[in-house]
Amino acid sequence: MNKEGKHQLVTEVHDKLQRAKAVFLADFRGMNVGQATELRNELRKAAVEFKVVKNTLLELASKGTDKEALNPYFAGPTAVAITYDDPVAAAKVLSRFAKETTNPFTLKAGVLSGKAISPADIQALADLPSREVLIAKMLGSMQAPATNFVGVLAAVPGSFVRALNAIRIQKEGN
């Protein structure tokens, strides 16, 4: 790649790193083409970009972004997974792939909210429920008091109606 191409790639990756909610680095040594394609397809479904970029170019691209915390990890074969939406979904796919493959695909590090995170932190992130599940749980928690209040309000007239009905049945029986 010539100097112009490298400059263009650095600019493109810099823009992506600035927009990203989270970035994960992995050592892809030992992956064959089939495994790489499978991983890319799974990551694409989770709206995650997966690229292999030279470490020196990654280091240049990360300058001026909150992803500079990853600079110490730019060593050896490095693949970068960039997510603009849900960091949990990306962590789930990467962690699952690292567990299921027989090759030594390993997570190196990541950055979330401008802070570097370890492979153990990435695994902890992967163990969280998905964003949709967390939102549903939160909405359920917020809705529960209102639902209970409506139930109590509905119970009072219902009890009154049942009492009147019992009195009516009692009087009809006499």
Curated annotation (Swiss-Prot):
GO terms for molecular function: large ribosomal subunit rRNA binding; structural constituent of ribosome. It comes from the Bacteria. GO terms for biological process: translation. The keyword Ribonucleoprotein applies. Signal peptide: none annotated. GO terms for cellular component: large ribosomal subunit. Keywords: Ribonucleoprotein, Ribosomal protein, RNA-binding, rRNA-binding. NCBIfam families: PRK00099.1-1. Forms part of the ribosomal stalk, playing a central role in the interaction of the ribosome with GTP-bound translation factors. Belongs to the universal ribosomal protein uL10 family. This is Large ribosomal subunit protein uL10. It comes from Geotalea daltonii (strain DSM 22248 / JCM 15807 / FRC-32) (Geobacter daltonii).
